[in-house]
Amino acid sequence: MKTLQAMGIPYNPDFNGAHQFGVGFMQHTIDWKTRRRSSAVDAFLAPVMSDPLLTVETEATVTSIRMDRDRAIGVDCIRKGSRKSASAGEIILAAGAYQTPKLLMISGVGPDDELTKHNIQKKVVLPGVGKNLQDHYECPVVATTKGAFGYYGADRGWPMIKAGLQYLMFKTGPVSTTGVETCAFYDPDGNNDRPTIQMFCVPTVYLDRDVMGTEPGDGVTINSLLLRPRARGSVTLASSDPFENPIVDTQIFGHPDDLRPTIAGFRFARTVLEASPMRELINKEIFPGADVTSDEALAAHCKRTVKTGYHPVGTCKMGQDSDPEAVLDTSLRVRGTRGLRVVDASLMPTIVSGNTNAAVMAAAGKAAGLILA
């Protein structure tokens, strides 16, 4: 944070406030009093678990939505090897941007060609199901540090015991955090009213996918994440088997305008490592290496190491009647059906320029009002 502020990036105490531009502490779903994770389950489900009107079935896989022509009347599932069915006046899907379109398609709601290809009985032909996939994608720059300034090694041996005791006694230390503590939102082209890059810092050598030649150790990893991708991917069926995962075509860098800001974001992350006071802590850049400087070399690095930011959205998008690929109406009802809604990240027409957690909770809150109306 101090380095970015020295570079002219202002401190921002609330990325969800009036302005997104700036550097600040990551906003987490952590209860600051107990220093424990406070998820949607804690906030919304736990308080009503004893309600006799609520039944929660875990370890269950929904195999299909039961349809009577165009009306959804229930779901079939398998739980611990046993087949079960549940019926309701309205069915609400919340399986996420990958599984919700899969469930719709294996139940006969989706693009004509997909249903025909997998010999699925057509209930409602809806071309937009599985289209419009968007995500945030990130690329890393990694450097070793001159000392043990981060969290490397805190998950084993005496450091792990020490971290556990520190948390139990004081609710501080590595166990009280996600490990991603600071981030910044900015635009490489200077349009900071509308940031296009989110940059976040992990205080260790961190790569959560196989990248040859880089070992964990004391260091720092800065990831640059593209907030407004232009490319659109898709989710299609591998088969009609409900237990088989769908085919996810991300189309990362499938639009020519996506690679340039990603490279610009990477270059900026590298300048952070080279600026004071950060540079006093840095030993050397180890990935991709200080000799990787040309646009061509950086493009190759980004294409090789790019990974998901775990924010997939858009595959059952909400839209106007005039949009042929709109899956949901403005009340989140699946077009062409009755008694069927979608309430998850797949409803977003365009991905939000930040983490999707709060946006999905906000959409769910709005959906609750629509359902009860």
PLM feature segments, named:
Residues 1-72, 76-78, 140-164:
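Conserved redox-cofactor binding core of oxidoreductases
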Residues 58-60, 124-126, 320:
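Short loop/edge segments at beta-strand edges and connector loops
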